[in-house]
């Protein structure tokens, strides 16, 4: 397991209760393994701070007045919010040595961009719950660009986490399935198809062990 992880939330995490709960569950699983966990969010919300596991450090990005209520679909405002997250993320990795980055939804684009511009190569986990190709999103150049960036980020991810087979099917075989792990939420007491917390924590540990596995040197 890594000694230090930076989780980068999506640009809409403050209005997305399922993502907040998923991040909290992931933090708890990593802390249980002895990892130091930092979390970067665009801004805090009462739900996020109310149940935040003790031991995690939370950082926020500078506030942009007109990027408060972002649409679910790809937009220029979401792109700007992601860029601000990227700048804050760059500042964090410049001050602390993280072993793994973990992006959620469009936070995956942030960690991919960071991996490209820094001297050090960061292995990153890409976790997608609401693909930018989700049904109902408007078609157009912005959506096409967002989908292209998302798929590019997934192709270069050390590991990919998806919540179910339906989410995997939305990508239409355009991502490396060998690196995909299907990990449902750890709420089996509410939904039979979910994991127990123990199953969830074990699955997260296996993903990180896979990311940090020794690799054979190229011939």
Residue spans of the language-model regions?
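N-terminal strand-loop element at the rim of the active site
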Residues: 9-14, 29, 33-77, 166-172, ...
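A charged, aromatic-enriched C-terminal amphipathic alpha-helix characteristic of glycosyltransferases
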Residues: 189-213
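N-terminal subdomain of nucleotide-sugar transferases
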Residues: 1-50, 151, 155, 159, ...
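Membrane-proximal helix-turn-helix segments that form the acceptor-binding/catalytic region
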Residues: 25-28, 87-94, 109, 117, ...
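Nucleotide-sugar donor phosphate/pyrophosphate-binding loop at the beta->alpha transition
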Residues: 18, 122-123, 132-152
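A short, active-site helix/loop in glycosyltransferases that binds the activated sugar's phosphate group
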Residues: 112, 135, 155-179, 187-189
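An aromatic- and histidine-rich active-site surface loop
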Residues: 45-47, 78-86, 90, 100-121, ...
